[in-house]
UniProtKB/Swiss-Prot annotation:
Protein name: Enolase
Cellular component annotations (GO), alphabetically ordered: cell surface; extracellular region; phosphopyruvate hydratase complex
Domain of life according to the entry: Bacteria
GO molecular function, one term: magnesium ion binding
Cross-referenced PROSITE patterns: ENOLASE
Residues binding Mg(2+): D241, E284, D311
Amino acid sequence: MTIIVDIIGREILDSRGNPTVEVDVHLENGIVGRAFVPSGASKGAHEAVELRDGGIRYQGKGVERAVAAVNGEILEELVGRDARNQIAIDQAMIALDGTPNKARLGANAILGVSLAVAKAAAESLCLPLYRYIGGTQAHVLPTPMMNIINGGVHADNSIDFQEFMIIPVGASTLKEAVRYGAEIFHMLKKRLKDAGHNTNVGDEGGFAPQFKSAEQAIDFIMESIITCGYKPGEQIALGLDCASTEFYKNGSYFYKGEGKCRNTQEQVDYLAQLVKTYPIITIEDGMAEDDWEGWKLLTDSIGKQCQLVGDDLFVTNSARLRDGIKMGAANSILIKMNQIGTLSETLDAVETAHRASYRAIISHRSGETEDSFIADLAVATNCGQIKTGSLARSDRLAKYNQLIRIEEMLGAQACYAGNWHC
């Protein structure tokens, strides 16, 4: 009944208007699982390969080659297989690709099929996706890390850091956390507008004002939190995604917005000072992806008081994560499914992190779709944290709304992660 009988890939558009892959997996019982593949703007050099067409069509960003792989080789390989055998299906696609980074068929082709297979299997068994993936123990609603000011490659402004996040650690439920975030988001908009700043939003729904420094952005957020009646640090904590690889060149960190250049030790000291000054409990990619020495210095400096998240550093890759664990670099990993390319490898990265007492944070990408898969994945893995953008743009809100539904479905079993930093 759960045998795969057809797979259909197609080219659609993501939240930035760029092509991406959508996949339908048809089962013998008539069930169809549909999945969409996200895409990032700031990509780590060690990520699995997202196959693009090149040429003039869509300015080279078309995905017809990836779609052809879905409708051709992958279809031929998987027809007749049982959708419930997720690991075997993922391994078959990895073997079919035959490269270490999924460069031949494309991680965007392989991931689309992998996720659609899981959705089809879950529906066939009449199970919510989070329950199918996570089993009976899946019950933790993640604390959202809400990106309300965008910078870096996510926005057309001069802020060097990519994301400034609010984290509703003091909420009692996921639904309440979303309310906290929405209220602060709208207050921030008012304060920015009153100060004469642009209130257009960036790729992830956060505002993108012309600030010259990280401190200026943080101060506006702090004022908005207080004006809403919340207590910084107690009810609302802060988080940063520095995306440092984007401004790391020749061993130094070049802050164009500030007109400053910091060496590795100065970068560590700067981040440590920010943590001392503000209620910052998490910093993502504080050091560049290949600055392993810097990561070790940063972890030794503030790793006991602040969550240090490796995104470009680890790229959801268990092997790179194990290297980081051995070195004592970072203490957490960001989980982005398209960085590695299959659901089973994603789950393996989460398990690897948890076994080493590293935290795992489920994350969206800047180029998203209406697919809410990561909301279910966050609950399935009991990770306790999710990054899925601001409180604007339907591609971001689709995930928050799905989490609200899941919390309702779980009823008394639901547990909001809240202040995981305690």
